[in-house]
């Protein structure tokens, strides 16, 4: 096994144990608001601490970028661990059992390892660049024959950037002409993994951060799916605007989405 994958899995499982234990006693959760519709809990921080401790033991010189702490610079800035210790914090806070731990390893700006762990379902999604993607050690393969007609598409709302809401609803309006239905689950990392595992047919979202989607992005691509930004380019980790789907679906999604976007999306 790839040694960095091994450490990422160990870190994700330890963090998942912290989250699962605290999920059973949510009345003890402490939360603070850090922005518009944006919360952090003591469990996010405890999960993050577990992950950092595991990484630091094996790779003390690597740089770690986390949602809650930001960048923890290491001597080796070529290797970056990009972490969301609890993707789906609001679901966790309200008792909706859908959230995950997301860990990606990027070497010289290329994602080499992706791990997303759902501690409630005990589902571990993994990928190594060039070696494919797996769910609990079973190989994942995107169904390339899928089309947008009758599809189930997942999305997330740009709730931290309300000015993007009109574009969000315009895109949904255009897509529902062909798609059958939408899902809005509250975990971008799991949405991407669900594209990789054929549980949904496509996914799109605006305003994400790298820690939301870096691991899931690799998992989709290693399962044979496509990931791009709204210009069909690859700047999504930077722009936060992402589409993931099998090849036929993504082409049709782009054709529907692009006419809905204003000048702020044109690069």
Curated annotation (Swiss-Prot):
Reactions it catalyzes: a myo-inositol phosphate + H2O = myo-inositol + phosphate
PROSITE patterns for this protein: IMP_1, IMP_2
EC numbers for this chain: 3.1.3.25
Molecular function terms from GO: inositol monophosphate 1-phosphatase activity; metal ion binding; RNA binding
Stored InterPro entries: IMPase, Inositol_monoP_metal-BS, Inositol_monophosphatase-like, Inositol_monophosphatase_CS, Inositol_monophosphatase_SuhB
Positions with a binding annotation for Mg(2+): 67, 84, 86
Record-level GO cellular component terms: cytoplasm
Annotated compartments: Cytoplasm
Swiss-Prot/TrEMBL cofactor(s): Mg(2+)
Signal peptide (UniProt feature, chain positions): none
Keyword Transmembrane helix attributed: no
Keywords, ordered alphabetically: Chaperone, Cytoplasm, Hydrolase, Magnesium, Metal-binding, Ribosome biogenesis, RNA-binding, Transcription, Transcription antitermination, Transcription regulation
Chain sites annotated for binding substrate: 67, 86-89, 183, 212
Gene Ontology terms describing biological process: inositol metabolic process; phosphatidylinositol phosphate biosynthetic process; ribosome biogenesis; signal transduction; transcription antitermination
Subunit structure: Homodimer. The rRNA transcription and antitermination complex (rrnTAC) consists of RNA polymerase (RNAP), NusA, NusB, NusE (rpsJ), NusG, SubB, ribosomal protein S4, DNA and precursor rRNA; S4 is more flexible than other subunits.
Xref: NCBIfam families: PRK10757.1 (NF008027)
General function of this protein: Part of the processive rRNA transcription and antitermination complex (rrnTAC). The complex forms an RNA-chaperone ring around the RNA exit tunnel of RNA polymerase (RNAP). It supports rapid transcription and antitermination of rRNA operons, cotranscriptional rRNA folding, and annealing of distal rRNA regions to allow correct ribosome biogenesis. This subunit may play a central role in organizing the structure.
Annotated family: Belongs to the inositol monophosphatase superfamily.
Name of the protein: Nus factor SuhB
């Amino acid at each position: 096994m790839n040694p960095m994958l091994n450490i990422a899995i160990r870190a994700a499982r330890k963090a998942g144990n912290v989250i699962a234990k605290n999920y059973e006693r949510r009345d003890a959760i402490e939360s603070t608001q850090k922005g518009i519709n944006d919360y952090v809990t003591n469990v996010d921080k405890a999960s993050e601490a577990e992950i950092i401790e595991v990484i630091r033991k094996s790779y003390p010189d690597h740089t770690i970028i986390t949602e809650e702490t930001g960048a923890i610079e290491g001597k080796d800035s070529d290797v970056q661990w990009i972490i969301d210790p609890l993707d789906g914090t609001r679901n966790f806070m309200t008792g909706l059992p859908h959230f995950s731990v997301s860990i990606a390893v990027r070497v010289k700006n290329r994602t080499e390892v992706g791990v997303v762990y759902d501690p409630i379902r005990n589902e571990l999604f993994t990928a190594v660049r060039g070696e494919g993607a797996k769910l609990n050690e079973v190989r994942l393969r995107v169904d390339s024959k899928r089309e947008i007609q009758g599809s189930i598409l997942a999305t997330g709302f740009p709730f931290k950037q309300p000015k993007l809401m009109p574009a969000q609803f315009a895109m949904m309006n255009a897509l529902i002409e062909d798609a059958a239905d939408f899902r809005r689950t509250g975990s971008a990392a799991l949405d991407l993994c669900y594209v990789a595992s054929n549980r949904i047919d496509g996914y799109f979202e605006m305003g994400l951060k790298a820690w939301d989607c870096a691991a899931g992005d690799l998992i989709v691509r290693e399962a044979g799916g496509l990931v791009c930004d709204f210009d069909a380019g690859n700047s999504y980790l930077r722009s936060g605007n992402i589409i993931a789907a099998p090849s036929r679906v993504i082409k049709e999604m782009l054709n529907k989405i692009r006419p809905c976007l204003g000048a702020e999306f044109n690069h």
